Regions:
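Low-complexity, highly charged intrinsically disordered N-terminal segments
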Residues: 1-57, 67
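Acidic catalytic cores of enzymes that act on phosphate-bearing nucleotides/polynucleotides
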Residues: 28, 32, 91, 185-191, ...
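Glycine-rich phosphate-binding loops that contact phosphosugars or nucleotide phosphates
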Residues: 48-204, 271-281
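Generic beta-strand/beta-sheet core signal
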Residues: 60, 84, 109, 139, ...
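Catalytic-loop motifs flanking and including active-site residues across diverse enzymes
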Residues: 68, 170-174, 242, 289-293, ...
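A short, gly/pro- and small-residue-rich
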Residues: 121-130, 422-423, 430, 437
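C-terminal amphipathic alpha-helical interaction region
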Residues: 342-347, 351-352, 383-386, 426, ...
Length: 456
C-alpha cells in the first residue's frame, strides 16, 4: 500500500488498511487528545481537592493502565506516586510499610473493570485502609464491573474511559491523564504536544508517525524484526510503555516485531534501532502519539490487526485453572540457563520472565543472567511477572517461535490474604507463573524455570 493511501486509510477509519475485521472500532485514540481536553478541568478540581489530605498516591493497574503512568512518574520524578502492578506478597508488604494509609489515595485503573490483579489490590487496600471511600477513585470504561463497584462503595470519583480505545493506546486518555494530573503534571501542555503531533501525522510528507512505522514495517520485511529502543536518562521508562505497544499490537499469527528496550542494534542483521525523541518530559505527549501511529502503520505492513490480542486470554485461563484446584502450585524447576542457551539458533532472542520481588538487588541478578545470554550473541528482553503478561505476553504466545524463555522464581514469603478470595497473593503469583509456563509449552516454546538463587 502506498504512503498516501495508508495514511488516508488510517484517518478514514478504513479497516481494509489492515485485515478488514473490526479495526475501525478501535481507533478512538486518533481523536482522544482533542476529547480528553474537554474533561480536564473536572480532573484538575478533583486533584486539587486532595492536596491537603494526601501524602502518597498508589495506582493499582496492569498493562495499558499502568505503563503510561509509570513512564510519567519516572520522567517527572514523582517519588510519592507509586504504581502497583505486581502480585508478589513481599512487594505488596514492602509498599504498605512505606505508606501512612490514612493519608494515601488509591487509583483503581482497569479498562475492562475485571482485571484480577487490579481488583485484588483494590480489595486488599480497601480492607487494610479501613474502607475509606473518599480515598479511592476508579478509572474504567462505562458500565464495567469496576464502575459498579466504585459507585456501590461510594468512591471519591469515577472517570470514564473511551471504549473505542484499547488499553495499550490509552496513554493520552483518562488512563494516562488522570494519573498525570494527580502527579502535578500540566496535562494541558502534555495534550497540546500530542495535538501538534496528531496534526503532523495527517500529512503525506514529513509525517513523523508514518516514517517510524515505515521503518518498522520495512525492516520486518527485510528480516530485521527486533526493535532496539534507545534508552537515555531523558526517556527513562519510555521503553516499558513502547514495549507493550509494539509486542501486543504486532505479535500474532506467527508474526511480530520484538521490542528490546535498552538493547543495542550493533549492526546485527536481525535488529533495527528506534530512537526516542524526549528532550524534556512534556515531549512525552507527542511521543506517545507518534509511536501509537507508527505501530498502527507497522500493523498494515505485517497485514495483521494491531488492535486485538487473541492469545492473551490463554495464560489467564491457565492461571484460573490452577487457582481452581485449591492447592498451592508445584513450581518444579526445569532445565537450566546453559541448557536453554544451547538450544539457541540464528535469529533467536532470550526472554527473562521474572516472577520475583522487584528490587534493585534482583535487577542486578537478572542483569547478570542477561549478560550471559548477550555474551552468547542473543538479544535479551526481560520483564517482571505478572506485569509482562499484560505487555509482551501476546508476542510470546502468538508471535514467531524464536524466543528462549527463562522463567525465574523465588520464595514469595508468607501468604497475604486477598479479601473475598479463597486464595492469597502468594498462591496467585505462583499460579500465574505456573499458568504462563504451561501455556508457552503448549505453544511449542522452548522454556526453562530456575530459582533466583541459581543466579547468585
Amino acid at each position: 500500500m502506498k504512503r498516501e493511501a495508508l495514511i488516508e486509510g488510517i484517518w478514514e477509519r478504513d479497516a481494509t488498511t489492515w485485515t478488514g475485521s473490526d479495526e475501525a472500532h478501535w481507533l478512538g485514540w486518533l481523536d482522544e487528545p482533542l476529547h480528553v481536553q474537554e474533561g480536564l478541568e473536572e480532573i484538575r478540581r478533583f486533584a486539587e481537592s486532595l492536596h491537603d489530605e494526601v501524602d502518597d498516591v498508589v495506582l493499582c493497574g496492569m498493562g495499558g493502565s499502568s505503563l503510561a503512568p509509570e513512564v510519567l512518574r519516572r520522567s517527572f520524578e514523582v517519588d510519592w506516586f507509586h504504581v502497583l502492578d505486581t502480585t508478589h506478597p513481599k512487594a505488596i508488604r514492602a509498599l504498605e510499610e512505606k505508606l501512612d494509609l490514612e493519608r494515601t489515595f488509591f487509583v483503581s485503573s482497569s479498562k475492562s473493570g475485571t482485571t484480577l490483579e487490579t481488583r485484588s489490590h483494590t480489595d486488599y487496600f480497601w480492607e487494610t485502609g479501613g474502607k475509606r471511600a473518599e480515598m479511592f477513585c476508579a478509572v474504567t470504561d462505562p458500565g464495567s464491573e469496576l464502575e459498579h463497584l466504585a459507585r456501590k462503595r461510594g468512591f471519591h470519583a469515577v472517570f470514564a474511559g473511551e471504549p473505542s480505545i484499547g488499553g495499550r493506546y490509552s496513554a493520552l486518555s483518562p488512563f494516562g491523564i488522570v494519573p498525570a494530573v494527580l502527579m502535578g503534571v500540566d496535562a494541558a501542555q502534555l495534550l497540546e504536544r500530542a495535538r501538534e503531533m496528531r496534526e503532523a501525522c495527517r500529512s503525506g510528507e514529513g509525517n513523523p508517525g508514518f516514517e517510524l512505522g515505515n521503518r518498522f514495517g520495512t525492516g520486518w520485511h527485510e528480516g530485521r524484526d527486533k526493535i532496539c529502543i534507545g534508552s537515555t536518562y531523558e526517556n527513562r521508562g519510555f521503553g516499558l510503555w513502547a514495549e507493550q505497544l509494539i509486542a501486543e499490537s504486532t505479535g500474532k499469527h506467527g508474526k511480530g516485531l520484538i521490542p528490546a528496550p535498552g538493547q543495542p542494534a550493533d549492526g546485527a542483521p536481525d535488529r533495527q534501532a528506534a530512537g526516542v525523541d524526549i528532550p524534556e518530559p512534556y515531549a512525552l505527549g507527542a511521543e506517545f502519539f507518534r509511536w501509537e501511529f507508527a505501530v498502527a502503520v507497522a500493523g498494515a505492513y505485517l497485514e495483521i490487526n494491531p488492535f486485538d490480542q487473541p492469545d492473551v486470554q490463554a495464560a489467564k485461563d491457565k492461571t484460573n485453572e490452577v487457582l481452581a484446584t485449591g492447592k498451592e502450585p508445584d513450581l518444579e524447576l526445569q532445565g537450566s540457563i546453559d541448557e536453554l542457551l544451547a538450544e539457541a539458533q540464528e535469529g533467536n532472542y532470550f526472554c527473562i520472565q521474572a516472577f520475583i520481588q522487584p528490587t534493585p538487588e534482583n535487577d542486578r541478578l537478572l542483569g547478570e543472567i542477561a549478560g550471559r545470554a548477550e555474551t552468547a550473541g542473543l538479544l535479551v528482553t526481560n520483564g517482571y511477572g505478572p506485569r509482562y503478561m499484560h505487555s509482551t505476553g501476546q508476542l510470546h504466545k502468538g508471535g514467531p517461535n524464536t524466543g528462549l524463555f527463562l522463567q525465574v522464581i523465588d520464595d514469595p514469603g508468607d501468604e497475604l490474604p486477598i479479601p473475598g478470595k479463597p486464595f492469597g497473593f502468594r498462591r496467585l503469583i505462583q499460579a500465574q507463573a505456573a499458568g504462563d509456563l504451561e501455556t508457552l509449552k503448549e505453544r511449542g516454546r522452548r522454556v526453562a524455570r530456575i530459582h533466583i538463587e541459581e543466579a547468585i
